[in-house]
Design a protein with these regions (language model features):
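Long, intrinsically disordered, low-complexity segments
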Residues: 22-25, 44, 63, 67, ...
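Bacterial Sec-dependent N-terminal signal peptides
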Residues: 1-32
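An aromatic- and glycine-enriched ligand-binding surface/loop that stacks and positions planar moieties
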Residues: 24-90, 197-198, 214-365, 507-512
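Conserved, well-structured interaction surfaces
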Residues: 39, 44-52, 56-62, 87-165, ...
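Structural register within alpha-helical repeat arrays
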Residues: 147, 154, 224, 231, ...
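Flexible, polar/acidic helix-loop-strand segments at domain edges
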Residues: 90, 94-101, 329-407
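Short coil/turn linking the two alpha-helices of tandem helical-hairpin repeats
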Residues: 160-164, 169, 230-236, 422
Length: 528
C-alpha cells in the first residue's frame, strides 16, 4: 500500500512534533519522544499524524522477528518451521520448542510479544498524558475523540496481552514509575471491554481517508465482538449473544452503506495494493520503501527457498523456512480454491518460465506436501506460505497492508456464536464465506448447521519420521466449524487462539508435536 503510507511515516511526529529529535526512519523509536509544546494540531490531518504514532507498535508486535504471528501460528497445527538441510533454522531449537510446547521464559518468542505490546500500551499512555496535561493543545470535541481513539487502541494492545499471557498488569498512568501489579485475567477482560464500550461511540464512522489504518467505530465493534467470542476462556463466562449483537451492528452497517463486504475472490484481500478492499475493516498499512525495519512483514523471506529469488526477482535471497503441516494440507477439499491460492506448491519456475532447480544438486525444485520431522527437512519439503501476494521485484519487506480485522471474520464470529447457542443460521453464514472458494463446484460451498456441529476432518496424531499415529478429529465438538476457521484464516496469526477456544490446543497431537498440558494455553510472563 502506498497512497496512505503518510499515515504511518508522518505518524512518527517528525520535526513538527519532536522537541530535539527528528527522524523519518521507522527503525527509530522516535514515537517514544515527548511531543513539543509548540505543536498544536489544527486539522483532521494534523490529528491523524499525532495519533498514528501510537499505532506503530502494532506492526512491530505482530510481524517483526519472533512476533505475535509466529507466537500464534508456529505452536499450532497448521504451520511448522523445521530444521532445513543446508539452510539452517535450528536457531537454538526455539522453533522446535514452539512446536512442541516446551518454551521457556527466556525464549525470544515469549519476550517479544510482551515487550513490543507493552511498548504500544506505553505509547498510548504517553500521548494521553501529554493531552491531559495540555502539552498537546487539543480542545473540545477533537480532544474528546482523540482520547477515545487512544483508549480503544490501548485496549487493542491488551487484547494481545490477555490472549498470550492472561493475568497481566493494567497500566494506564504514564508517570507512575512504580512496579505494576498483576491483574486477574477477568479484571483485564473487564478493563478491555469497558475501554471499548465507553469510547467507541466517539470514534469516526468513516472507514477510509485519514481514518484508514485507525480504529473507527466499526473496527471497535469488531474488536469487541472478538472479546465476547473468547469471553468464556478469558473471563470464565460465555457471552455468545453479546458477540452476535456486536457482529450485527457491523453487518447492518455494511449492508446499508456498502462500505464493507466480502471480496469476490479471497485473494483480493491479500494483494499488494489491497488498501481499497471492502473486506478490510482495520488494516496495518505497510510499504516496502517507507517501512524500513529489516524484518517488517517478511513472510516471503522466511518461507520461500533461496532459489525462489529467481521466481519473483527479489532483491534479497530468501531463507527457506516455514511451511504447512502436512496433516493440515490434507484436510482441504481438493476443489477448495484456497488451497492453491494460499499455498505455493509443486514445480517452481524462474521469472522467465524456466524450470527452477535446486542449488544443492541441480534437481527440479518441487514443493511437496510431506515433511519428515521438525528436526530434518529438505529445501523443498512442505507447501509454502502464499496467501499474501509476493509482487515481482520486492525487497525483503512486503507492501501489502495487513488485514487485522476483516468482514469474513465478522460473519464467522456470528456463525460460531449462533452455533454455540443452538440457534439456526450458522450454516448460511459459513456458506456465504465458502462460496467464493468453490465457484467451479458451487454445491460444495453449501454447509448446514448440523454439519458444522460435527467432528473435524483433520487427522490428528503424531505424524513424522519418528512416529505414526492416527487419532483423527471426529471427537472434537464443533470440529467442522473449527475446520472452516482453519481453511479461511490460515497464515493470519490466530490459529492458537481458535484451537484454545475449541479446547484442543493441548489435547491433540500433530506432526512432531505430542499432547501437552493445559498450562501451555498461556505463555509465561518473561523474566526480563
Amino acid at each position: 500500500m502506498k497512497t496512505n503510507i503518510k499515515l504511518w511515516t508522518m505518524g512518527l511526529m517528525t520535526a513538527a512534533l519532536l522537541g530535539n529529535t527528528a527522524c523519518t526512519d521507522l527503525l527509530h523509536d522516535s514515537y517514544g519522544q515527548v511531543v513539543s509544546e509548540d505543536y498544536v494540531p489544527k486539522t483532521e490531518e494534523d490529528v491523524s499524524y499525532l495519533v498514528n504514532a501510537a499505532y506503530i507498535p502494532w506492526r512491530e508486535t505482530l510481524l517483526q522477528w519472533n512476533g505475535v504471528v509466529r507466537a500464534q501460528e508456529l505452536c499450532a497445527d497448521q504451520d511448522v518451521l523445521p530444521a532445513r538441510d543446508g539452510i539452517g533454522w535450528v536457531d537454538g531449537y526455539i522453533y522446535k520448542r514452539w512446536h512442541q510446547h516446551t518454551w521457556t521464559t527466556e525464549d525470544d518468542g515469549v519476550l517479544q510479544g510482551w515487550e513490543r505490546t507493552y511498548n504500544g500500551v506505553n505509547t498510548c499512555n504517553r500521548i494521553l498524558s501529554q493531552i491531559e496535561e495540555g502539552v498537546i493543545s487539543v480542545d473540545g470535541e477533537t480532544k474528546e475523540k482523540l482520547i477515545a481513539e487512544l483508549k480503544v487502541l490501548r485496549a487493542s494492545y491488551y487484547y494481545i496481552l490477555i490472549d498470550l499471557y492472561g493475568n497481566v498488569p493494567i497500566v494506564t498512568d504514564f508517570k507512575d514509575t512504580s512496579l505494576p501489579q498483576q491483574s486477574t485475567r477477568k479484571e483485564v477482560f473487564d478493563f478491555i471491554v469497558k475501554e471499548i464500550t465507553e469510547n467507541m461511540d466517539l470514534l469516526s464512522e468513516t472507514p477510509r481517508g485519514y481514518y484508514y489504518g485507525r480504529f473507527n467505530k466499526w473496527a471497535a465493534h469488531t474488536l469487541l465482538a472478538k472479546m465476547y467470542l473468547n469471553a468464556e476462556v478469558w473471563s470464565g463466562t460465555a457471552q455468545w449473544q453479546k458477540c452476535i449483537d456486536e457482529c450485527d451492528i457491523v453487518i447492518n452497517y455494511a449492508e446499508k452503506s456498502g462500505e464493507y463486504a466480502l471480496e469476490n475472490n479471497q485473494k483480493d484481500v491479500f494483494v499488494t495494493h489491497n488498501e481499497n478492499s471492502k473486506e478490510i475493516i482495520f488494516a496495518l498499512p505497510f510499504d516496502e520503501i517507507y517501512v524500513t525495519g529489516w524484518n517488517d512483514f517478511d513472510f516471503h523471506m522466511y518461507t520461500l527457498a533461496p532459489e525462489n529469488q529467481d521466481t519473483y526477482q527479489l532483491t534479497a535471497r530468501p531463507w527457506g523456512g516455514v511451511c504447512a503441516v502436512p496433516q493440515f494440507i490434507n484436510s482441504f477439499d481438493e476443489d477448495d480454491a484456497r488451497l492453491e491460492d494460499n499455498y505455493i506448491q509443486g514445480q517452481q519456475y524462474t521469472y522467465s518460465g524456466e524450470i527452477l532447480k535446486r542449488s544443492i544438486d541441480g534437481k527440479p525444485l518441487i514443493y511437496t506436501v510431506d515433511v519428515p520431522s521438525i528436526d530434518q527437512s529438505d529445501v523443498d519439503d512442505g507447501f509454502r506460505w502464499g496467501k499474501f501476494e509476493y509482487a515481482t521485484g520486492i525487497t525483503n519487506r512486503l507492501s501489502n497492508d495487513w488485514p487485522l480485522l476483516r468482514y469474513a471474520d465478522v460473519l464467522m464470529m456470528k456463525a460460531e456464536s449462533l452455533m454455540r447457542l443452538g440457534k439456526s443460521g450458522a450454516g448460511a453464514l459459513v456458506t456465504q464465506v465458502r462460496e467464493r472458494a468453490f465457484k467451479n463446484e458451487p454445491e460444495k460451498a453449501q454447509v448446514t448447521d448440523a454439519e458444522l456441529m460435527g467432528g473435524s476432518v483433520y487427522d490428528y496424531g503424531r505424524r513424522d519420521s519418528y512416529k505414526t499415529e492416527h487419532d483423527g478429529g471426529t471427537d472434537i465438538k464443533y470440529g467442522r466449524f473449527l475446520d472452516e476457521l482453519s481453511w479461511e484464516f490460515c497464515q493470519e496469526g490466530r490459529r492458537r487462539q481458535d484451537m484454545i477456544r475449541f479446547g484442543i490446543f493441548t489435547t491433540k497431537a500433530w506432526f512432531s508435536h505430542d499432547k501437552s498440558d493445559e498450562t501451555k494455553n498461556l505463555y509465561p510472563i518473561p523474566n526480563k
